Amino acid sequence: MEGPTHPKPSKDKTFSWDLMILVGVLLRLDVGMANPSPHQIYNVTWTITNLVTGTKANATSMLGTLTDAFPTMYFDLCDIIGNTWNPSDQEPFPGYGCDQPMRRWQQRNTPFYVCPGHANRKQCGGPQDGFCAVWGCETTGETYWRPTSSWDYITVKKGVTQGIYQCSGGGWCGPCYDKAVHSSITGASEGGRCNPLILQFTQKGRQTSWDGPKSWGLRLYRSGYDPIALFSVSRQVMTITLPQAMGPNLVLPDQKPPSRQSQIESRVTPHHSQGNGGTPGITLVNASIAPLSTPVTPASPKRIGTGNRLINLVQGTYLALNVTNPNKTKDCWLCLVSRPPYYEGIAVLGNYSNQTNPPPSCLSDPQHKLTISEVSGQGSCIGTVPKTHQALCKKTQKGHKGTHYLAAPSGTYWACNTGLTPCISMAVLNWTSDFCVLIELWPRVTYHQPEYVYTHFDKTVRLRREPISLTVALMLGGLTVGGIAAGVGTGTKALLETAQFGQLQMAMHTDIQALEESISALEKSLTSLSEVVLQNRRGLDILFLQEGGLCAALKEECCFYADHTGLVRDNMAKLRERLKQRQQLFDSQQGWFEGWFNKSPWFTTLISSIMGPLLILLLILLFGPCILNRLVQFVKDRISVVQALILTQQYQQIKQYDPDQP
């Protein structure tokens, strides 16, 4: 750009050469980055640094990709100036600076311009010139000629601070006063910051590489010498802490996804015709798998099918998401992941209860060793947490003395290295090296924008963008400890949120119950197989009786089958009993008002339909007589006035005179 013709000589723009070394060092600081996927989410931190003092003027962190994590940054002009603009012997009253409220106020009304140092233009000079040795180097700022640029990375403009800026007369400068020093001044701000600036990234800045810090120079536009301030903008990219496994099974985190069988397509019978396409990693919940073994006898109770259980999980997730964030559910796809893990835990902060006796939740929920292979976030931890899992802890408590129980809030669990449990015993925790993290348990459901599925059916040849998979657990994390699951709050919204979350909890409970039945069926199959093997073994021993039995005939060591299914059967019986107790506890926690809506599905529709007319009728009955009386009284008053006017028109006023006057 070509700058205007200014009557200011370029020789006035001088600065200390010592800053060139500092800027040269900062420009060579590189952040080592690999070549990751462009859709990977990072924790991005942007920092504005005063190059003279090395202090940070602003540090903003956000989650996003390397192409969209560009926030708007706010800072004060004095944060990048420090004490470099304080008056000197040559200019005792400069009209700018940050050491006094009056100078800060005068500085606020002075224009400024910014010149980039990353352009490496020789005519613009170096740090001693603020990269503005000649006119035309400025790319942004707040002056009357409004400098702009199509290639620079940032724009810097003045911000707005509310307050009183009348510094004449009584000397009230409002926010230019530091409230820590002048607490009695009306409108005093933190540190006397009354020169706010707004930094935004341009389109060119969003496309450039931020491998190292980039510097700029800011100068005031005034008569005489233009003071210089140097600052840099840098980006720090950190990977988000990966989820870690919690539980005794250390094999789950390293397990591979299940292999795809070629015959599986012939065993899928679609219930509804919804297209022939499919997406890897997504479970088709509208399909049923043909049984591979003997079907269940008619005498056995009818259980909900696999397809219905999966649909209930997705439907419960949708209802919970629709209540908490309805804008996200206007047009989206919720996909149930078909590969393990099927559930994930989100570490949360919560107020767990400390009880001397075991609460009902400790008795009704299953206490088997269930491993959660993915736990992410940061929450409350208790016990001696190893260094490998300290990233999951935002608040750590070593333990409690005594023999009492810590019950997790409703809808949450303790994920311990010995398994998942709703409550923990401090006696066991103090005796062992166990540690636990408070988590929320969510089904593994991913959230996608509508374009995600459309791209799979698009037959045109184009490069498809890799979608950003966002699990619903990250979107609903903190829902239970926020009070919805516990029913905290009053009104229709609180009851609705509690009901929707309860439906999701019931769907997960049904899925876990189906898992128990699958394990029981596997145990029965194993027992039946062992009986067949033992029967064949006895038959072969009879055939080789003369040789001394089968083992002697084979000249091998004799092997005997040890059946451990009895222990499995006992554990499954206990699990069924606890599931039954949990169902009873779940039913007992529902209030009488919630029971109305659960007993009859049409009751909710009936209430919502007749509630409006009933309220209108009630208002008419309450306020109708009063309004009618007021209306009748008003009509009577108007009629009385009209009657009085008619009567006065029939008579004439008699003239009065004084008889004493002639």
From Swiss-Prot:
Keywords: Cleavage on pair of basic residues, Coiled coil, Disulfide bond, Fusion of virus membrane with host cell membrane, Fusion of virus membrane with host membrane, Glycoprotein, Host cell membrane, Host membrane, Host-virus interaction, Lipoprotein, Membrane, Palmitate, Signal, Transmembrane, Transmembrane helix, Viral attachment to host cell, Viral envelope protein, Viral penetration into host cytoplasm, Virion, Virus entry into host cell
Marked site (Cleavage) residue numbers: R465, E466, L645, I646
UniProt GO cellular component terms: host cell plasma membrane; membrane; viral envelope; virion membrane
Organism: Feline leukemia virus (strain B/lambda-B1)
Pfam families, alphabetized: TLV_coat
UniProt-recorded name of the protein: Envelope glycoprotein
Region of interest (Immunosuppression), residue spans: 534-550
Gene Ontology biological process terms from the UniProt entry: fusion of virus membrane with host plasma membrane; symbiont entry into host cell; virion attachment to host cell
Region entry Fusion peptide, spans: 468-488
Lipid positions (S-palmitoyl cysteine): C626
TM region positions: 607-627
